[in-house]
Amino acid sequence: MTHEEAHETVRGWFTGRLPEEWFTGPVEITIDREEIAVIGPLATPETGEGVSDAERSAAVDGRIKAFREDTRDRRIAIAREAEHRFGHKVAWGVDCEGRRALFTHLSVPVMTRLRQPERRVLDTLVEAGVARSRSEALAWAVRLVTAQRRLAA
């Protein structure tokens, strides 16, 4: 089975297994060597016209929190089935009104070889107080690049 076929199998299984009422559209499935991330779109809360950004933001926070709490037991059961079937841990997340929230996901150590100029960049981030260690500085840099790519998209 090719990588693409495996991805399609996982996506199809989750599409068939997830309750239809959970999400307003198709889920986004991301797979790497350790984890399957399932991110679904939630309905935007009805706030009425003329509400402040703070009220709208609080409504989105409430919608995300309610989904997380209300679906916890079923998500755990589905994740266990998927972990047994596909051999990967499952992480859950939602997207609501452009805000993405991941509930639980793996933090996996990644080994890399860096030359001195690259290590100096990490050391500068540590010295500036951006990170406590080279590892944390590297994670910070990856998050920064990811955020910039989202803005550019």
Please describe what each predicted stretch is.
Residues Q116-E136:
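Surface-exposed, Lys/Arg-rich phosphate-binding patches that contact polyanionic backbones
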Residues H3, H7, R11, R68-R75, ...:
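Generic alpha-helical secondary structure
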Residues A91-R113:
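Short Lys/Arg-rich basic patches
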